[in-house]
Structure formats: C-alpha cells, structure tokens
Amino acid sequence: KEEKIPKHDLLCGGFPCQAFSVSGKQKGFEDTRGTLFFDIARIVNFHRPKFIILENVKNILKHDSGKTLETILNTLKGLNYNVYFELLRGSDFGVPQNRERVFFICFRKDLNIKNFILSKPNFNFKSVKDILEDNPNLDDVEIKRNDIIINDKKINLDLLGNYQSKPIRIGIISKGGQGERIYSIYGTGITLSAFGGGSAAKTGAYLIDGKIRKLTTRECARMMSFPENFKICQNKNQAYQQFGNAVIVNIVKFI
C-alpha cells in the first residue's frame, strides 16, 4: 500500500530486468515482473518525490520496437516529471565488467531542473586482476574437469594490446556454452548474472594462478563496487544471485 510507505524526496527503483533482458524471454509488460513499473508509478503519484532514479537492462531501449521505452517515458512525464535516461557502462565507473544498464533520472517539474546532463565519469580502469582475493578458499570455486581447453597464444600478455577494456576469452569448458567460457584476468570480466547454468554459472570462469575457477562471492562484491565491510549472505547461491541482480554502487553514487 502506497500510503504505508514513508514520505521521501528520492525514490530509487528497479523493476525486474528479467522481463526485458536478452537472456530472459523478453515478455516485457506481459510478464508480471515487468508490470512492477506501474506499481512504482502508483507510489510516485501518491508521494510525489522530488527525484526518481530507475534502472533496467540495455535491451529495454529497443524492446517491443521501442514501445516499452515510450510507455515508460510517457508514464513518468504524465506524472509531471522531467525525464532523462542514460546508458551507462560499468567499466567506465571503476569496476571490471561492462554491465551496460539504462538509468532513468527524473526531476519533479516544479523544481524547474531542465537540460540535465550527466557529467563524464573519471575513474581509473580496473581489470579482473585488481579485484581478486589474495588467498581465497577454492573449495567451492575451482573447476576440475578433463574437458577444459586453453588457447595458450591468447594468454600471452604481449598479445593483449588494447583489448583490456573488454573480456578476453582464452578457453572453454566442454562445448563453450554459457557458463563454460574461460577468460583472462587482464581484461574486464563478463557481466555477473543472477541466473544461468554451466560450471562457471553467474560469474564466468577465469585462469588464476594456474587454476580455472569462478569468482568468489567477495570478488563479485568488488565487481559491483560494494565496500569491503559489506556483509555477504552466508548462502553462497543466494549471494551470487544477489550480486547478479544488484546495481553497481559507484554508478548510483555518481548519479
């Protein structure tokens, strides 16, 4: 009930991305999860916060030939908000994953904030190597299989050149499907996912100190720029899913 929600100046929300994600079934507003946006609109209509920040996946820009985006913009504008949206990439904000997400930044019209432009981020580049734990417990993350194939040429650092700003695939597990691809720690990581199968589900696999392994939950926290004192869920499956669903902290703080 919207009346039970305390008054607030800023509403932050993310209607579930699975309804619009390329990796999902892309049912959009036909998915009950996608209709959560209209619950957000209902809360906005009741409380009239000064500012709104909403987040969703890149695919929402073109979902249903642009009709989904048009509905979102028209709904927010109809509630008397000036609406701006930006496609932001995680690797531009000091984390080693591209993770492109759309952010809707809205100002109540009576505040008279017009022509809003988000300034350019100024973060140092990070590779996966920069977020690794020093002595992690490998019991739950190391992948030991006899169908691992590594391309030795691709792990030679002299060959990397300017490819550090994207994931560098250096091998596969089994047939190399989703969750079965191996990457170098000297590039960015793949986008963390809340779902997916394969030996390296949710994080991807990396060659680290001669071993093939997934990222630890703490490394996933760092991939999302969570602080070191953030308490991680003890249930590791839940923790991986939470980080796959999370928003990059640095981006929200920057906005």
What are these regions (language model features)?
Residues 7-8, 98-103:
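Short, surface-exposed amphipathic charged segments that create phosphate/polyanion-binding patches used
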Residues 1-51, 58-70, 77:
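Core alpha/beta nucleotide-donor-binding catalytic domains of modification enzymes
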Residues 64-68, 100, 251:
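Residues at alpha-helix caps and immediate loop-helix transition turns in enzyme cores, especially N-
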Residues 58, 80-92:
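Conserved S-adenosyl-L-methionine
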Residues 16, 56-57, 89, 107:
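A secondary-structure boundary/capping signal
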Residues 75-79, 101-255:
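S-adenosyl-L-methionine-dependent DNA methyltransferase catalytic core
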Residues 1-2, 90-95:
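A short acidic, often aromatic-flanked loop/helix-cap motif at beta-alpha or helix-coil junctions
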Residues 18-22, 60-63, 94-97, 111-114, ...:
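Short catalytic/ligand-binding loop motif for oxyanion handling, primarily in non-cytosolic enzymes
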